[in-house]
Amino acid sequence: MASRCSEPYPEVSRIPTVRGCNGSLSGALSCCEDSARGSGPPKAPTVAEGPSSCLRRNVISERERRKRMSLSCERLRALLPQFDGRREDMASVLEMSVQFLRLASALGPSQEQHAILASSKEMWHSLQEDVLQLTLSSQIQAGVPDPGTGASSGTRTPDVKAFLESPWSLDPASASPEPVPHILASSRQWDPASCTSLGTDKCEALLGLCQVRGGLPPFSEPSSLVPWPPGRSLPKAVRPPLSWPPFSQQQTLPVMSGEALGWLGQAGPLAMGAAPLGEPAKEDPMLAQEAGSALGSDVDDGTSFLLTAGPSSWPGEWGPGFRAGPPA
């Protein structure tokens, strides 16, 4: 027996010893571990631990997933409306959530309506900015002080360079209601000497714009006598528009105010002498001179003609053949 155990086939001699270890699987494994300690690390336990570790991980992840689902269902139950006969199981809660979302999307605005509302808001903001810019520009042109800075010491002067670089349209039909000369006159007094500092080209352009837009404003006394550039001639100084149009542009029967009728009632009987009714009345030179001096430079407008002439010289139905009587 000793010679057989010393043979180089130890597996055959180990088989009965393995079978003799308690006769069970656990005993066989323990015996195998004891026999394999000297040869190296055991490989059988590592094979047995692999599937068990993966199984434990799957169980843990499944438990976490179920916890999340139950928590979400509890939140949905609290958010959904309460009514009689509502089911509280998980499937019913999910179905009610889907139906509620469909109803909300049908009643609420869609994505296209959201885009339309956003674009309309942007247009409204841009319109408000445009109105604000127009208001500020009109205040600057009219010389109104800014509300934030309080009352300014003087009117604000517009930038002539910016005005020349971007002038308004030269078409009178598309022109703004306020002409350029009035804007310039309200911002500062017109001084011909200021054109020399601007240059001949800019001065010519500015004068051309003023002529198109209604003529130059009345010139004030220049601060310094600066000679006008050679070769240039000032346009005719246009005086402020008369309150009465010229006599050639008046109607045949001019409309007179109450004050003019009062003057006529006072001057008419005194200006006429004891002439017959059919003959023209003679004019008193003293009364004519007083009327002319009272009116000043309005002689060209025809006002003195109305105040000094008698009724016999009026054209139309107020002529010599007029007879006062009740209307027919």
Swiss-Prot record:
Residue ranges occupied by any bHLH domain in the UniProt entry: 53-104
Subcellular location field: Cytoplasm; Nucleus
CDD domains for this protein: bHLH_SOHLH1_2 (cd18908)
Entries under SMART domains matching the protein: HLH
PROSITE patterns per record: BHLH
InterPro entries, sorted: bHLH_dom, HLH_DNA-bd_sf, TCFL5/SOLH1/2
GO molecular function terms listed in the Swiss-Prot or TrEMBL record: DNA-binding transcription factor activity, RNA polymerase II-specific; protein heterodimerization activity; protein homodimerization activity; transcription cis-regulatory region binding
Low complexity: bias regions: 310-321
GO biological process, one term: cell differentiation
Keyword Heme attached: no
Pfam families: HLH
SUPFAM superfamilies: HLH, helix-loop-helix DNA-binding domain
Role this protein plays: Transcription regulator of both male and female germline differentiation. Suppresses genes involved in spermatogonial stem cells maintenance, and induces genes important for spermatogonial differentiation. Coordinates oocyte differentiation without affecting meiosis I.
Subunit-structure text: Forms both hetero- and homodimers with SOHLH2.
Protein name (Swiss-Prot/TrEMBL): Spermatogenesis- and oogenesis-specific basic helix-loop-helix-containing protein 1
